[in-house]
Curated annotation (Swiss-Prot):
This is Putative F-box protein At3g22650. It comes from the Eukaryota. InterPro entries: F-box-assoc_dom_typ1, F-box-assoc_interact_dom, F-box-like_dom_sf, F-box_dom, Gal_Oxase/kelch_b-propeller, SCF_F-box_component. The lineage of its organism: Eukaryota, Viridiplantae, Streptophyta, Embryophyta, Tracheophyta. Residues 3-50 form the F-box domain. Pfam families: F-box (PF00646), FBA_1 (PF07734).
Length: 383
């Protein structure tokens, strides 16, 4: 299509058209005319579009290539791994916020850790220099100050006691650091003491600029949802979990509709799956409502081994649960894992949506992320 200086359509009509087009096709309009190109770079439009498509989640898989999988449409796309990750042996942690992915990467040569923010859709990467060093046992949060949507911040919780097991239990107070993209610097939060810990296998979730994790008290058994508000830079307990979680059980947290949480629980004994959802997180009191309770011989085992990816899932716009599943192959000498995406309906019907191939458990020579849910966006990587 020939390019033009200006479109014959009014800008509000162009915006309305763009808001109905999937993000994968939007960038094609960059070549149409300068007016359309400018719209796709306009901050107001970028966030308006993102909010409209919050329910258009995808799974991202990084093996020898980057795969974006849309389980609702049964579609997938692929692209090369960014050159910035050439010396990365492994991406061990991801946190998603507004289409941006915070990645903790292990350096292939030095075996040390680095931190990057990456927009897979725009193929942009920014490395974040540490205040001191990054640890294998850091926990991270990613959000923004609600005063301004694009003022992004990172949270780092460094627990030296976990890093070095020879330390005397309880002798080290976890260090809290905040990185502000606006000032391009880290700072330590001095007056925060933590008497709780984040559940290590579970992925944290960023919702409307705040961070949420499954956590537990250090000196008693209760499990709860812990949040961090990036505007006030404070921690807050949101609510307790609506069930008891045993050692063999699996629990996974996800965002829902852009303003609430959902929580998946699979019993390690019966394999029954239940999903709970909250009311709006902005409400004064946040509580759980059971969304679905499924008992079926067709249910997959979501977390069969500690070496496999912790479950990732989301609830689509048709109220189906899309779950990333990994199953070890039955061959004794085979180190591969079969990867698929399953759909669980509210009626308990289980259906495999996509066979995503295999992954090698023993491979340690490439970045690898298997099944992380995120929303593609036009949000630029903060400078």
């Amino acid at each position: 299509m020939a390019s033009c200086e200006r479109s014959l359509l009014p800008i509000d009509i162009i915006e309305e058209i763009c808001c109905r087009i999937p993000v994968e096709y939007l960038t094609q309009f960059k070549l149409t005319c300068k007016q359309w190109f400018a719209l796709l770079k306009d901050k107001r439009f970028i966030y308006k579009y993102l909010d409209l498509f919050q329910e258009q989640e995808r799974f991202i898989r990084i093996d020898r290539i980057v795969q974006i999988i849309d389980p609702v449409k049964g579609a997938r796309s692929s692209s090369p791994i960014p050159q910035e990750f050439d010396n990365v042996a492994q991406i061990s942690t991801m946190v998603h916020c507004d289409g941006l992915l915070l990645c903790r990467c292990k350096n292939e040569r030095s075996r040390s850790y680095k931190l990057a923010v990456w927009n897979p859709f725009l193929s942009r990467v920014k490395w974040i220099e540490p205040m001191d060093f990054y640890s294998s046992n850091d926990f991270y949060g990613f959000g923004y100050d609600n005063v301004c949507r694009d003022e992004y911040k990172l949270l780092r919780i460094f627990d030296g006691e976990i890093e070095d097991e020879s330390e005397i239990a309880g002798s080290y107070e976890p260090k809290i650091q905040i990185y502000d993209f606006k000032s391009d610097s880290w700072r330590i939060v001095d007056d925060t003491r933590l008497d709780w810990s984040i559940d290590p296998p579970c992925k944290g979730v960023s919702v409307k600029g705040n961070m949420y994790w499954i956590a537990h008290w250090n000196n008693r058994p209760e499990i709860f949802i812990q949040s961090f508000d990036f505007s006030t830079e404070t921690f807050k307990i949101v609510c307790n979990l609506p069930f008891e979680c045993n050692v063999l059980d699996t629990a996974a947290l996800s965002s829902l509709r852009g303003d609430r949480l959902s929580l998946l629980h699979q019993s390690g004994e019966t394999m029954k799956i239940e999903v709970w959802i909250t009311n709006k997180l902005s409400d004064e009191v946040v509580s759980w409502t059971k969304y679905v309770d499924v008992t079926s011989p067709d249910l997959p085992t979501l977390h069969t081994d500690q070496h496999l990816t912790h479950p990732s899932y989301f609830i689509d716009k048709n109220d189906n649960i899309m779950v990333w599943c990994e199953q070890e192959t039955e061959e004794e000498t085979d180190d591969d894992v079969c990867v698929s995406v399953c759909m669980i309906s509210k009626d308990g019907i289980v259906k495999k949506q996509i066979d995503a191939g295999r992954c090698d458990l023993c491979s340690d020579n490439r970045p690898f992320v298997c099944g992380y849910a995120y929303v593609p966006s036009l949000v630029p990587v903060p400078e």
